[in-house]
Amino acid sequence: MKPLFGLETEYGLVAAGPTPSAEDNLLAAGTLLSAIRRVVPALNADRGAGIFLANGARAYVDAHHLEYATPEVTDPWEAVRYTLAGDRLIERAIEQWIHSSDEERPRAFKGNVDYVGRQTWGSHESFLHRRHPREVSAQLMPHLVSRIVYTGAGGFDPYAPGVTFAVSPRALFMEYPESSSSMENRGIVHTKDEPLASGACRRLHLICGESLCSEKSMWLKSATTVLVIAMIDGGLEPAAGLALADPVGAFHGFARDPACTVEVRLSSGAAATALEMQRRTLALAEAHADAPFMPDWTRAACREWRATLDELARDPRSTATSLDWGIKRALFERVLARHGSNWELAAAWTDALKAVWAAMRPERPPAEPPDPETLLEPVEAAQARMAGAEAICRRRGLTWSELPRFVALRRALFECDMRFGELGERGLFTDLDGAGVLSHRVAGIGDVSSAVTHPPATTRARVRGKAVRELAANPLDYTCDWNCVVSARANTWLDLNEPFETEARWQPFRIGRAASLQALTQPGAPSADWGPSSRRELARWCYLNGNYGGATRLLEALLAEDFEVASTHGHLARLYLTTGDREKVRHHVAQAWDARADAPAYVVARTLWLQILVATLDSKDPQPWINTLKTHLARSNEPSAWSMEPVLDNLTDTLELPALAMMLSLYRAIAGDDPVSDLDEYDWWTGEGRGVGATT
């Protein structure tokens, strides 16, 4: 199968002015989104925020960041070209904004971490595949963990109180191998399944990557990951012999290892470095380079992959002009030298500050040390001196009175990191590249300026982009999505469910407005639609509007396609709880439990809550299911798994009071909280919103 994938870049924005607030920055993101419309033709997104562009891409504001999602591409050269087109588009939009108003220029950054607020953003990746998501996740994990030797953005450890270089700062924010959340409790693999296509197409979504500036780093990130996914789809097992005993621990270990020599433990009991893991994966790709399931550019990718690993093995510092983290490390060392410091001295200060914090609060050291700048405040400084800060520093060859100089150095390094990825002429990477001191370019990237306004030719982005260009003059009559363009006035829609569709096929309108939704759910209604995700949302709409028959037909059709089997059976169980059909509730809960092996942790937890409820309603002992739930929650350690909401939400009128009271009591006993207040903002159908103890 031909590869198909895309990338998202999250841009940090700082509004004009001496002290812009978060609200100012959010307003700037919205204004910049409007300015993009004046740079390239655009249509409003049909379901959700943002706009789709004439190059097939999407731009939108999410969590105070302006995001640009590339159109679907088929090779790493296109991936780099359209990622750079996003940068170019933002730069042009800023110029457009300045020319049309008296406001000062806002600043846009391709960054990944806010060290002061300990927040992260970066770059998401989406890949088309056909294997089961759980299989892909397991087989891809060793590659994702070890690829940061060439995909790391470089920066600093956000949890260190001083200054500690990190190959990949964002990696240190990943807490789980898998997670359904992208805002809190992040996982290396994002488990939310949103295909955005029809048939057997599945979409792998990764949130562990970083925004990059080096063409070589960007190219390698996409090329190598596509090859590993192709091998998995082809029936190979890239993780054979490389499964990690602790994927998150290994990810963090490699992220803190600029020498590329740290060994991590494998499930087999053996140990391996990131470079050794990468070489074994590369060898498998080389051995199957001519297989029909591999892209036709596999050999070219393997040559560049091997050359990069060889370079890192000889001396990681040799990447000081080619890879993001190598370039940054060399740049930071120049800043250190200008301040009369070096990595060893910075490490001594970091160690001293850790000891100072521990001495100041021996009864309960903070999980995350406060910013060392707070030690410059008089009260904190006095406490530190009383705790023996001077002695702590002397033992490390430091002088406590020099702390202000170290804090100033830290600020300078953080500013350097931020400015590295700034768009426009103020960016340090742009400055270095313009000076000709870097060697990061990749041959064959092509015309970036053309990619700002024109889509790729070999995917459905071609049809989408062409439609946007032709229809943008009538923005109130048309809306767009990844898998459709909708004409409300003409009652037609452009079907883009086929990822490689390159010809426009307008069809009669069947989904999208209330009348059409009702019509689609009637017996004999046409089955064509916008894909299984849309049918799931349509079923939700029917359920919330009391159309239980329509919801049932849609959900049963999803089961016939094996779409999210455990989750869909759970939806049907909840529907029949509402209608009072106990026998069907039992059936679908049992079916959901049988399909649990392929389900995310939060779906398994929901199924267990339903098992407990069924046992309670049937006057049976629910304790075995309660014990299973407790064990599952302890193992999954995923806050979204705590939601009892499918059992409670909108069911208070259909549950007998004793059963409801028992469930509430049980929930408080397990979760230690009041579930009702946490369920108000939780969307049971999609699993998004607030769960106990977490926000998303």
Residue ranges and their predicted role:
Residues 533, 567, 604-606:
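Start-of-helix register in tetratricopeptide repeats
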Residues 542, 576, 613-616, 651:
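Residue at a conserved register position within TPR or TPR-like alpha-solenoid repeats
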Residues 1-110, 138-156, 172, 179-188, ...:
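Terminal catalytic/cofactor-binding subdomain
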Residues 537, 571, 608-610, 646, ...:
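"A position-specific structural signal for the A-helix of alpha-solenoid helical repeats
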Residues 516-517, 555, 589:
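Hydrophobic/aromatic packing residues within the alpha-helices of TPR/SEL1-like helical repeat arrays
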